[in-house]
Amino acid sequence: MTLLILLRHGQSVWNQKNLFTGWVDIPLSQQGIQEAIAAGESIKHLPIDCIFTSTLVRSLMTALLAMTNHSSQKVPYIVHEERPDMSRIHSQKEMEQMIPLFQSSALNERMYGELQGKNKQEVAAQFGEEQVKLWRRSYRIAPPQGESLFDTGQRTLPYFQERIFPLLQQGKNIFISAHGNSLRSLIMDLEKLSEEQVLSLELPTGQPIVYEWTGQKFTKHAPSLG
């Protein structure tokens, strides 16, 4: 059984304040920290061989906190791929107690452009709720100077296919800690959702989604798998 575990980061400080966040690098709130720890509890008995996060701190914090009580007792270590010598471990004994963690901006949240840092209710009052709904929930319409969900998938999916999927094919169990829209674009592909179907896909913060790669397809497991 080869597993793919997806987790939207815990609540961030700007989620709490109802602000558009996007690529602004905001940490988890106190609630988000607790959500990440609770998510870790629900997956602590699932095998994990590699971890992938975005380059944003809320994604990294979530992954690290979720792994603090993993039954393997293995420690995540960040692989600096631009300088592999920085994270090279010269002890085989220690290597066996570690899980590599890779970061990529391809997994970053959708970039919200000129909306970043603005209050969602205030933006709705300024531009109208229908316009904001189009920016937030349509598939191809982007906010000013930002990305649509389609645009997000244009970077997320190639990275998954080139970097992550080959590891699944090798039988590696993968844990991805990322963001609402980068994960929505990925789930759209995994579950073969239409452009209309993905619009109703909601991913709560801090709640893992588990798939099994059968060698032929991805099968979604019930939340109780962990």
From Swiss-Prot:
Species the sequence originates in: Chlamydia trachomatis serovar L2b (strain UCH-1/proctitis)
InterPro entries, per database record: His_Pase_superF_clade-1, His_PPase_superfam, PG/BPGM_mutase_AS, Phosphogly_mut1
Family statement: Belongs to the phosphoglycerate mutase family. BPG-dependent PGAM subfamily.
Protein name: 2,3-bisphosphoglycerate-dependent phosphoglycerate mutase
HAMAP family tied to this protein: PGAM_GpmA
Pfam families from the UniProt entry: His_Phos_1 (PF00300)
Enzyme class: isomerase
Keywords: Gluconeogenesis, Glycolysis, Isomerase
Site (Transition state stabilizer): 179
One example of a Gene Ontology biological process annotation: gluconeogenesis
Catalytic activity: (2R)-2-phosphoglycerate = (2R)-3-phosphoglycerate
Pathway: Carbohydrate degradation; glycolysis; pyruvate from D-glyceraldehyde 3-phosphate: step 3/5
EC numbers on record: 5.4.2.11
Binding positions (substrate): 8-15, 21-22, 58, 109-112, 120, 136-137, 180-181
Active site: 9 (tele-phosphohistidine intermediate), 109 (proton donor/acceptor)
The gene coding this protein: gpmA
GO MF, one annotated term: phosphoglycerate mutase activity
SMART domains, per the entry: PGAM
Cited function: Catalyzes the interconversion of 2-phosphoglycerate and 3-phosphoglycerate.
